[in-house]
Amino acid sequence: VFFIYTVATVSEDRYRLCIELISFILRRKNIMMKYLQKLGRSLMLPVAVLPVASILMGIGYWIDPSGWGGGSPIAAFLISAGGAIIDNMSILFAVGVALGMSKDKDGSAALAGLVAFLVVTKLLSTGTVAQLTQVDAEAVNTAFGKISNQFIGIISGLVAASMYNRFSHVQLTPALSFFSGKRLVPIMTSFAMILVSAVLFFIWPVVYSGLVAFGTSISELGAVGAGIYGFFNRLLIPTGLHHALNSVFWFDAIDINDIGNFWASTGTPGITGRYQAGFFPVMMFGLPAAALAMYHTAKDKKKKVAGGLLLAAAVSSFFTGVTEPMEFAFVFLAPG
């Protein structure tokens, strides 16, 4: 009887422990989901600007398809206007995430996001790394030349928002009272990003080199490798790290140079263009179809709002190949 009682007691304790563990996991999962949903809403602020910028660039390329603005001042103006947004997408992410993730959506958080991004991209730029390591700029890891990406922008925004939520109401001594409250946030963000930069100094080259090495290995798989490349290209777009993978196939990193050979007509039929052709069905038909599906599944009261955003994103994808507005829409938000 004592043995049966002991086993039953132990089993009951284990059962209770399992229930508590499952409850803890579910609570953590719920917190994480709410955090990611808030991050998604924050990202939609900068993402909303992208379709207009993409359309401006698309019109410019349509006016001057061969010279890309070199043969038409109007085309050059439109391409430059749109490129000002697209080329600085990571800065928009830093500001938008910092503002959206702050507790009261104050402009000081947005300023802190900009400060965070400027600090990390300056400290980890090729020139600064060359000075810190006492080597020539040409000898610096190429990863530091790609530090201004969306992934770094999101990290900068999250750090800035965290600093704002923590220090925006801190009051310093009377002698330093001018720097109290919200004025303290950009200062603390700068110090925090120095530490983040120190960590990224060691981690970022490994991440970037790993992506390049991965691209090099799958390039040896022929057509199957092209499919794998396309899959991971789409997967990495929300972080901006797809540029590391693209550099392996599109340019002359490992003697593939897909874009260069295609435009120079010096490639091999059936091989050259392999790492570009698969994008056209997705950009011209797949994503616009996804936009239509999201519009139809949106709630009736939100169809007009969703329709405006999705139409601009679909046009951007079809005509210009800029797919981020569409992809960020369904990665971070539900259709409704």
Q: What does each model-found stretch correspond to?
A:
Residues 33-174, 178-180, 333-336:
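Early transmembrane hairpin of solute transport permeases
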Residues 89, 266-268, 275-335:
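Alpha-helical membrane segments and immediately flanking helix-loop junctions
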Residues 83-89, 146-151, 181-187, 218-228, ...:
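Membrane-interfacial loop-to-helix junctions in multi-pass transporters
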Residues 67, 120-131, 188, 221-228, ...:
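Juxtamembrane membrane-interface segments at transmembrane alpha-helix termini
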Residues 2-6, 13-31:
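Short, Lys/Arg-enriched N-terminal segments with co-localized hydrophobic residues
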Residues 245, 249-278:
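Interfacial juxtamembrane loops and adjacent helix segments
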Residues 42, 58, 162, 175, ...:
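Membrane-spanning helices that line or support transport/gating and their immediate boundary helices
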Residues 197, 204-254:
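Aromatic-rich transmembrane-lumenal/periplasmic boundary elements in polytopic membrane proteins
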